[in-house]
């Protein structure tokens, strides 16, 4: 039976020791979306929101979120990220904006949490910048899509 690595035998939380792990190229891709009203979607799509370039600011916020992950997630190791790429895909029919983040490092632990945090921060920034016109936006479907590197190798969502 698998065990939770962030707890010792007494059930106390601790930061996992990654000191003996090999330095490898680590990659993680995460995604999520935000659903909004048609009028809100048009503001985002057209770049006419009162607060400015929603997607441009959300992109910077997502990158910053990846960089600050270890400050937000208590047992997450600080990483020297080598790449954070943020992509937004607009779906007019569903009135959604999908945020996809690819994070990379060369290190001893994976970048899944950085990619997931970046997606959430990017989507929260869209919410923040548009909440004056649409408080009913829904953030959802946030998930890890793939990870590569390290002892556990490659994993791709089904």
UniProtKB/Swiss-Prot annotation:
* Keyword line: Lyase, Molybdenum cofactor biosynthesis
Question: According to the lineage, what is the superkingdom?
Answer: Bacteria
Give the catalysed reaction(s), semicolon-separated: (8S)-3',8-cyclo-7,8-dihydroguanosine 5'-triphosphate = cyclic pyranopterin phosphate + diphosphate
Q: What is its EC number?
A: 4.6.1.17
List, in alphabetical order, the Gene Ontology terms for molecular function in this entry. cyclic pyranopterin monophosphate synthase activity
The catalytic site is made up of 128
Matching InterPro entries? MoaC, MoaC_bact/euk, MoaC_sf, MoCo_biosynth_MoaA/MoaC, Mopterin_CF_biosynth-C_dom
Task: Give, as in the UniProt entry, the pathway in which the protein acts.
Answer: Cofactor biosynthesis; molybdopterin biosynthesis
Disulfide connectivity for this sequence is: none
Q: Which GO terms describe its biological process?
A: Mo-molybdopterin cofactor biosynthetic process
Q: Which residues bind substrate?
A: 75-77, 113-114
Q: List, alphabetically, the HAMAP family matched.
A: MoaC_B
> What is this protein for, i.e. what is its function?
Catalyzes the conversion of (8S)-3',8-cyclo-7,8-dihydroguanosine 5'-triphosphate to cyclic pyranopterin monophosphate (cPMP).
- Please report which protein family the annotation says this sequence is part of: Belongs to the MoaC family.
Q: How does it assemble?
A: Homohexamer; trimer of dimers.
Protein's name in the database: Cyclic pyranopterin monophosphate synthase
